[in-house]
Swiss-Prot record:
GO terms for biological process: L-tryptophan biosynthetic process. The keyword Amino-acid biosynthesis applies. Belongs to the TrpC family. One of its GO terms (molecular function) is indole-3-glycerol-phosphate synthase activity. Its EC number is 4.1.1.48. It catalyses: 1-(2-carboxyphenylamino)-1-deoxy-D-ribulose 5-phosphate + H(+) = (1S,2R)-1-C-(indol-3-yl)glycerol 3-phosphate + CO2 + H2O. Pathway: Amino-acid biosynthesis; L-tryptophan biosynthesis; L-tryptophan from chorismate: step 4/5. It comes from the Bacteria. The keyword Ribonucleoprotein does not apply. Pfam families: IGPS. It comes from Stenotrophomonas maltophilia (strain K279a). This is Indole-3-glycerol phosphate synthase. The gene is trpC. Keywords: Amino-acid biosynthesis, Aromatic amino acid biosynthesis, Decarboxylase, Lyase, Tryptophan biosynthesis. InterPro entries: Aldolase_TIM (IPR013785), Indole-3-glycerol_P_synth (IPR045186), Indole-3-glycerol_P_synth_dom (IPR013798), Indole-3-GlycerolPSynthase_CS (IPR001468), RibuloseP-bd_barrel (IPR011060).
Amino acid sequence: MSDILQTILARKAEEVAQRRAQRPLEELQAAVASAPPVRGFVRALQAAVANGDPAVIAEVKKASPSKGVIRPDFRPADIAVSYEFGGASCLSVLTDVDFFQGADAYLQQAREACTLPVLRKDFVIDAYQVYEARVLGADCILLIVAALDDTQLATLSELALSLGMDVLVEVHDIDELERALQVPAPMIGINNRNLRTFEVSLQTTLDMQQAVPRDRLLVTESGILGLQDVALMRDAGIHAFLVGEAFMRVEEPGEGLRQLFFAA
């Protein structure tokens, strides 16, 4: 398949093999014991929703395959502080190097600069990356259903939960949602961006929301750019958001967050 996701996954498999060669799995597993305590990612989102507020996962993202460099002046620690002041519940930090110009160090810098729980935003395909996420200080990992078979999805989710992390299981269509619901993770992310074409439609979330059980926190991801987008989702009963680009394009990301979600 010659789509963007498959290209990314092929490269990710090579990257994981290279990392294993540099740092054996056993060494990584041993390092988990000295990882910083988890901060409670889902708990932070649920607390915001229970309070009647939007629960915002604010993304720390330098670039993307579809848009190129989004934020040339990229300082993860400053961005994290700005987001915390702006009212974010959690952070999402891109760590994919080749396609998003991310880095593991960006996650560490962002987390050390604030008190918010942090999602490691990457293409997780191997248990090695789950241990790696915990050692880096991640409080949550992303599992993309389109990138995994059912066995991988179950195994990686179970491992992450056993290490104390939360899991955001990401879907784009009903078939993927049915697979995601077999995993006992408390969050379902509906990505409005098709990872095979990178086209975006907010209707994706609206069409699928009724199929998400009430005991799962629904997070809408991608394409939330303006006040009308937020109003559309909140009117539909969706109160958890993952937003990056809209904030990365303004000088003060936290102020962008406040204006989009808390100015009214």
